[in-house]
Amino acid sequence: RQVLLALVSSFAFAGGHKGLDWDTALSGDHRSESNRGRDQYRHPRETLEFFGLSAEMTVLEVSPGGGWYTEVLAPLLKDHGQLVAGHGAPNGSAYGRRSLGGYLQKLGRAHDVYSAIDVRVMQPPAMPLGVEAGSVDMALVFRNVHSWLRAGTAEASLADIHRALKSGGTLGIVQHRGTDGMTVEQMKRTAYVPESKVIEMAEAAGFELDGKSEINANAKDTKDYPGGVWTLPPSFGAGDDNRAKYAAIGESDRM
């Protein structure tokens, strides 16, 4: 039985997150001031506690991008667990190469923090994650569902994750939250995906919804920007136009 946690909670499962060095993970010198400043929107500790993270787990971070969450996960898992980063292929697209290259450079700049990370190619269906089936305790997907929809790889990505997870393992998803009734094209264009759509896709892949909550909700997010979610911080896709307005809204409303 695999478990899907679709939303990030403001509370935690009792007993599931003992022995974690949150001070180092959140306040260590390996994190920039700007990245620490985003904690107010992303609530990393509350998020990971809700998902049930513990120090001895093998955790898969799917498509970690620039490594914002890697900064938090790596110190928490280094001594007793394992962090697997499922990133893009070195021989992929120009964007994929830049993303992977930047990620590896980040790991190299603070090797003492990141030395234990196992970086793997994960680009299903062509290049599925090369780990043993049933070897992962927890898989984490941070704001990547819209990218799957754009690439047409949602089904393959969820199947790859399902294969990697142990029986009873946990899939935790954070995603820009859209409104019911959106078309798939609207989801692709704006990066907002309805909660019901995410749950539907995960359940179709064999996952079972176990919990959801509102810790990363943002009622100020009107979700009606011509430039989609990238209009809001940190991207500020509209440049200086209405920048103060979008800064006051903050980062997106997230499931």
Regions found by a protein language model. Name each.
Residues L20-F50, S54:
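Class I SAM-dependent methyltransferase Rossmann-like catalytic core
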